[in-house]
From Swiss-Prot:
The gene is arx-1. Belongs to the actin family. ARP3 subfamily. Keywords: Actin-binding, ATP-binding, Cytoplasm, Cytoskeleton, Nucleotide-binding. The lineage of its organism: Eukaryota, Metazoa, Ecdysozoa, Nematoda, Chromadorea. PROSITE patterns: ACTINS_ACT_LIKE. It comes from Caenorhabditis briggsae. This is Actin-related protein 3.
Length: 426
């Protein structure tokens, strides 16, 4: 069967989790931790030489002895070393990454790679050399017929189109991508990332979990120590929200606590006895560290709204309004209730204050045009990058712009240094 008749495989490799599935679907078929459990000697940096020695000695079976995803973190892999091939979005161990992709394709997707085109994602500022390594693995190890490497921020912009009118769809915008390990603010102009203006915020989902864990540790002694992180993570996902004003929220809880308090019920994994946790201020203080980072990190005190405003002011002047008008949220850590509303309010205040200052400094001669700040949240926000890839890989034009195996054999891996933004995006 022609590889054009079968849907493309879309794989979004993140620091914490990997999303994989087939093009045309609205959600990934599998979401698994980006972890791989291997035997110690294979996990060493000299893994290729060790594997060669094993094969010569007839012990190459060790090469196949590994787990990925949830299995890598399960008790069954307790005698293995757990490795994370991706750090801050960038692949650091290509040998382990190849084995990880191997099981993604054969065990999870159950696909023959020779029969499917592949769309893989990359973080902003990924190096051209990393694209070449990806191409070598995909074309030489898996013999794929075609490959396209897409920037995650552009796919997140594309995913936001589903909830908007065709006339409102734009490839100029600011993507706030906040996952488990890091938050990126990425400006995109006409489908291309403005690399010099990207900002990294050292606060993400994991930091919120740690912050809630510390708050609970101070007053809740019923939580088993070995379960405190998972309890904090569950509380974050079930009960947390963003409030418009922290001080007023404290007053609300103190005035009528029964209305706002929640209870988390759990089972001690060792004694099997039930325990309960009262969840109060943690509900709104957790996500608040995006807007008041000094709550948890004294070395970083810039609110996310200030970072966004500063970033946009550093971009070329002709795209600034387009960026303010299209701030798109992506990733699980942007899913808190009212996160978009508060972010829009705070960025609007900053931009209005700047316009007011310009008018004052001009003595009233300048009347700046108001800036329309729009923060876009949508149903596909959690898996925005994967969904954007699924949308693009299901178009006929995807097959025309993907790099083919024949191209690779003729020109080498350098062809994948450039992946054009194609018509479906423009």
């Amino acid at each position: 069967m022609s590889s054009h008749q079968l849907p493309a495989c879309v794989i979004d490799n993140g620091t914490g989790y990997t999303k994989l599935g087939y093009a045309g679907n609205t959600e990934p078929q599998f979401i698994i931790p980006s972890a791989i459990a291997v035997k110690d000697k294979v996990a060493s940096s000299n893994a290729q030489a060790l594997r060669w020695n094993n094969r010569v000695g007839g012990a190459g079976i060790d090469d196949l002895d590994f787990f990925i995803g949830d299995e890598a973190l399960s008790p069954a892999a307790s005698n293995y070393t757990v490795k994370y091939p991706i750090r801050h979005g960038i692949v650091e161990d290509w040998d382990l990454m190849e084995r990880y992709w191997e099981q993604c394709i054969f065990k999870y997707l159950r696909a023959e790679p020779e029969d499917h085109f592949f769309l893989l994602t990359e973080p902003p500022l990924n190096t051209p050399e990393n694209r070449e390594y990806t191409a070598e693995i995909m074309f030489e190890s898996f013999n794929v017929p075609g490959l396209y490497i897409a920037v995650q921020a552009v796919l997140a912009l594309t995913a936001s189109w589903q909830s908007r009118e065709a006339s409102d769809r734009s490839l100029t915008g600011l993507v706030i991508d906040s996952g488990d390990g890091v938050t990126h603010c990425i400006p995109v102009a006409d489908g291309y990332v403005i690399g010099s203006c990207i900002k990294h915020i050292p606060i993400a989902g994991r930091d919120i979990t740690y912050f809630i864990q510390n708050l609970l540790r101070e007053r809740e002694h019923t939580i088993p120590a070995e379960q405190s992180y998972e309890v904090a993570k569950t509380i974050k996902e079930k009960f947390c929200y963003v409030c418009p004003d922290v001080m007023k929220e404290f007053v609300k809880y103190d005035t009528d606590s029964s209305k706002w308090l929640r209870t988390y019920d759990g089972i001690n994994s060792i004694t099997k006895r039930p325990f309960s946790v009262d969840v109060g201020y943690e509900r709104f203080l957790g996500p608040e560290i995006f807007f008041h980072p000094e709550f948890c990190n004294p070395d970083f005190t810039t609110p996310i709204s200030d970072t966004i405003d500063t970033l946009i002011q550093q971009c070329p002047i002709d795209v600034r309004r387009g960026l303010y008008e299209n701030i798109v949220l992506s990733g699980g850590s942007t899913m808190f209730k009212d996160f978009a509303r508060k972010l829009q309010r705070d960025v609007k205040r900053l931009s209005d204050a700047r316009l007011q200052m310009s008018e004052t400094l001009s003595g009233g001669r300048l009347k700046p045009k108001p800036i329309d700040v729009q923060v876009i949240s949508h149903k596909m926000q959690r898996y925005a990058v994967w969904f954007g890839g699924s949308m693009l890989a299901s178009t006929s034009e995807f097959y025309q712009v993907s790099h083919s195996k024949a191209e690779y054999m003729e020109k080498g891996p350098s062809i994948c240094r450039y992946n054009p933004v194609f018509g479906a995006l423009t």
